[in-house]
Amino acid sequence: REFADLLEADLDWLGLAADEGGSKGGPRGPYYQSERSAIYEEYYQKLVRKGLVYPCFCSRSQLHAADAPHRSDGNVVYAGTCRNLTPEEIVLRTARRKPAWRVMVPDETISFVDGHMGPYADNLAQDCGDFYLRRADGVFAYQLAVVVDDALMGITQVVRGADPVSYTHLT
């Protein structure tokens, strides 16, 4: 938290003072992801109940090999290797390796207007495929945490660099 407090002080100095959060407190806390696991679990379980989450047993080397030939941007498009495993296959694989958990993404184009970059359209299924929501060690992925946090904290405007613009439609 020491570094978070220093960052908050720097932002205050620049005139970018937050209304609430971190050391300031407020009604939408807790403000540190490490303290929000129960909140993420609640929303993760909603996706599980809807049948949108599945276990993935692929190692990084398997994912990298399955995506050959590799894209010039370095991104790996998940091929859906574990998406349709039978319950029996899941039990067998779980005995050998603890799974990470992915969310199923639809194969459709999503369009929005970015305040800086202008009109943007992307098909997440083709751009990255089903993505991780939870690592094998139980830690929730950024992609879940940021969506839940933005929604619950009333975030309406987000400034991002060009590299994560493809995550915008997740929020």
What spans do the regions from the language model cover?
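N-terminal Rossmann-like or analogous alpha/beta NTP/dinucleotide-binding catalytic cores
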Residues: 1-71, 166-170
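Active-site cores that bind ATP or allylic diphosphates and position pyrophosphate for catalysis
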Residues: 61-170
